[in-house]
Amino acid sequence: MYVQRNREYRGKHAMERLAPVDFSNMDRNYYDIAEEAIRWFRRVRKEGRGWQVFPEPSVPELWPNAKNSQSYPWDHAKAEIVERYKDITRLWQVGFKERQLAHEQSIYTWDDATLTPEIMGITGEKKALTLKKIIEVNRESNTDFVLPPIIDNNRGGWQQKSALEFFVDFETVNTIDDDFSTFPQPGGEELIFMVGCGYESPDGDWDFKVFTADELSVSEETRIIEEWFQHMREVSDRVLNERSALPKIFHWSYAELNFMKSAQRNREEAAGGATLPEWPELPWFDFLKVMRAEPVVVKGAFGFGLKAIAKNLYKHGLIDTSWEDGPVDGLGAMVGAWYCNRQVAETGQSMRDMDYMQEIEAYNEVDCKVMWELVNYLRENHT
């Protein structure tokens, strides 16, 4: 969508969504950006051979930006540099501009005793407090692995353990895998292809079930979601009693809710207007909101991502589960699903039977299980 002369333009396919590039007005800065890029390219070719990263950057441009995810194939090298520099962009919601303000005050590391959110231009009370807590827990002088010692936030009564709670994570694909066979109409589909669901059984053990699509399709997405609904209903009837309300469904961030909305749209569009049974309203509980609201901070974690939090709890011996080293992460799971789906077309085999998909299932279970262990750890030690 764009607006020109107070008129709004919208489009559904690629040719309808073209927008003008106005070099005489709002887009005139692209000339300067292009010239700057050319100058940088020439400078690197001429001078770059003599630049050094360690012990400190020989030119300002070599300071890494931990928030920039477009670093392939240099991701690991950049991570090492960020770690050794104790770079300020490693901090939660701190980027290039905030670091520049700190550098202007001759502050170059996140553990500098004089670094404050205000120096970085961060004045919002809540954001500033959160940053101070992250810096505090990560200082070498601090011996606590988790702060605060006692968590006040009891949103949704989470501190009181219920007889049954579900811990859920989705694996999904987006529309990037578009072969352009339908161009200019968009191709690819945003789908849930795996639902992992775990809970603590009455005897205290972890119980987990995963629902995986046979192929990437709306019908398979609908099938695994409805099987997951049925599974939660059966477990609730067995552990609680028949016709009891579903218990809390713990998840991490708003992603699951957004993908459920997308799955509902996919289902309705596939039905072509036919009447469908209503999907149940689910008692979602986003534990990330609890972590941010308090805030709960962990030594070694510089933000609130589930992996950063859980890996460092595991490192400190506070939970028992973590991810094994391997090719699977969120992006790897997505690419793996596309690969497996192509194998379905070639072999007629279900994605569920493929080795790579089984690795993704194992990865998904860890996502769910570390949430369970994390919540239990905080209940037992910080409430």
Segments predicted by a language model, with ranges:
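Conserved RNase H-like, two-metal-ion catalytic cores of nucleic-acid enzymes
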Residues: 142-241, 267-269
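Generic, well-ordered alpha-helical scaffold segments in large soluble proteins
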Residues: 101, 105, 116, 171-174, ...
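Short, well-ordered loop/turn elements at secondary-structure boundaries
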Residues: 96, 104, 159-163, 191, ...
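Acidic, Mg2+-coordinating catalytic module of metal-dependent nucleases/exonucleases
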Residues: 4-90, 96-99, 105, 309-383
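Flexible loop/turn segments at secondary-structure boundaries
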Residues: 109-111, 121-123, 143, 173-177, ...
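Charged, flexible boundary elements
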Residues: 121-157
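Conserved DEDDh/DEDDy metal-dependent 3′-5′ exonuclease domain
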Residues: 1-37, 208-335
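Helix-hairpin-helix
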Residues: 83-133
